Amino acid sequence: MKGTYIYKQNGIEIGRSENVITTDGKKSILQYLAGTNPDWASHMVIGSINTAATTSDKTLYYEVARSPINLKSFSSTSPNLIVKSTFEPYFAANIYEVGIYPASNSATFGVRNDLIINDFSLQSAWTDSGSAITGQWTEYLAQSPTSPRIGMYSLTVPSNKTYTNSSTYFDLRSYTTVDTLDLLLGPITTTSDPKNFTVKFTNSAGDYASLVYSLSANVNWQVKSLALTSDILNLKSISQIDITTASGLTVKIDAMKINIAAEVDETNSLVSRSIPTTPIAKIYGAPLEIEYYLDLQ
């Protein structure tokens, strides 16, 4: 079996990429063909990290959006199975990984889902001691290696600095301590390694709890993860986020999300994962169509 993703914006092809069909994916496809699995392609997903695809992949490395499959067809000539999904217009991303899941998160985990807490698209939401943050934003630019990979902006937090977002709201009551808070980070500079980066959550009652990430100098994009603690989950609903760098640490942050990937098993893990040679630009205001062609020969 082999597969190909084709990317279209406004009906025009803007790229294509070959894929790796995972070990679990082959099982899902064969079980579907045998009638023992209700579906093999339920949702298309896009992400931000271009680590090489392998047959053991169970999730994208940093999923930023998923969309239901809205068209399925069959061809008697190669390729045999064709599916299509359309991502809604109103977000921006540079896509470095793409995949297919056999089941939706809602079918597997109920109300729980990956949750993008913040992608730094709204500059006015973040302040420096109550004042607007200036000179620290990087604006989205299609396919640029320095551009945000999700959202309209990324934010550079300089040494010994706290930035605050007090106009946020999200609910943690459906999550558990096996879930993680994943940070999508760009270049990191330090005076010595490692340095602490603190994410503090506060609820409307003024109760708070923090996660402290240990960061080292790095020129590449990466994901840093820490498990949610009971103290954070006990806050229930979050109304403020503070992010703080230690002295000697400067870090670019692009997104924060809660990840439920630890609970993914072979019945709901990735069928296929692909790394485009050139990142695919998802332009704000334009839907993105992704077609997947699976050759069963």
Regions found by a protein language model. Name each.
Residues 1-96, 101-118, 130-132, 143-153, ...:
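Small cysteine-rich, disulfide-bonded extracellular modules of the LU/uPAR three-finger superfamily
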Residues 111-263:
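Beta-rich carbohydrate-recognition modules and glycan-binding surfaces
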